[in-house]
UniProtKB/Swiss-Prot annotation:
Bilayer topology: Multi-pass membrane protein
Name listed for the protein in its UniProt record: Cytochrome b
Entry's Gene Ontology BP terms: mitochondrial electron transport, ubiquinol to cytochrome c
Residues engaged in binding heme b b566: H99, H198
Alphabetical list of PANTHER family matching this protein: CYTOCHROME B
Entry-linked CDD domains: cytochrome_b_C, Cytochrome_b_N
Cellular component per GO, a single term: mitochondrial inner membrane
Alphabetized GO MF terms: metal ion binding; ubiquinol-cytochrome-c reductase activity
Amino acid sequence: MKKFMNFFSSNEFLKMIMSTIYLPTPVNINYMWNFGSILGIFLMIQIISGFILSMHYCPNIDIAFWSITNIMKDMNSGWLFRLIHMNGASFYFLMMYIHISRNLFYCSYKLNNVWGIGIMILLMSMAAAFMGYVLPWGQMSYWGATVITNLLSAIPYIGDTIVLWIWGGFSINNATLNRFFSLHFILPLLILFMVILHLFALHLTGSSNPLGSNFNNYKISFHPYFSIKDLLGFYIILFIFMFINFQFPYHLGDPDNFKIANPMNTPTHIKPEWYFLFAYSILRAIPNKLGGVIGLVMSILILYIMIFYNNKMMNNKFNMLNKIYYWMFINNFILLTWLGKQLIEYPFTNINMLFTTTYFLYFFLNFYLSKLWDNLIWNSPLN
């Protein structure tokens, strides 16, 4: 036993792993801090299920749709792997949005490196999910890819050339499908690498907590206390996940994707998966094509502006103004998601413009509300 422990203490790689397991963690963190580890579980589920599906998938426009049918009908447990991978993407993004919203509420963006890497993971995940959505080669897959890739043509001077280069031709074709499959296969591995960097950056600074305090006296070992606590969260989320896979497997998808891609027949309403609807809604709210593309990209990149916040309050728990505004922002996000699947007609277009404006205003007005609250607290006669 002594030799075994000496081996652990002398091996640098194992020491690094053990330091991760026994990381000093604030004693008062709640279940909102569980979603990061749940995200790790879903990332591994996506990588493993995707690897198994890739053995039977054919990235060819003539047989891609039928290879999916073959996976569902003839491959042993293929239907289960496909449903897990398909609905796993929805759960992955749901957990990620909850994870980001918790960080916004508790001001975890003050851990600048952790926050910056996290936004990169979000962008890479969105790219991987978009390319994966094209692979089944259904109607919505084809037309979704056509619309989104065409947005690059809004870039002045070089836009059209970039679109042709991505397509590998004058329209979405076999070369496009092959490229998307290759990128969809490799991107999750790059995301996994970024997650490791994310964890390294987190372990350099330590986790935040609901009070925003940073006292080492109030920290305990992550294992076994919080590892056991995390397991309960895993069981609950995985139970809900498998329940949806077995009872409502196609509830989160689009019915148009059960039809094979037909370039001669445009769907009535082209829309992406539900987890991209908020960004798609912002894209549609701006009449100018280039402006819409900039709005789409900035809907994610604007999260980087949080790094420059220097409010004295370490979270919104005790900041009444910011707390109210935060929940207004969450409702705004949900309404943008709902508006993204509505038809482009009155009154949805007008409401869309309003909520797009308030979405971006949050990141600027929130800063001034924090400053106002800081001044009220720190300049109070009681201080």
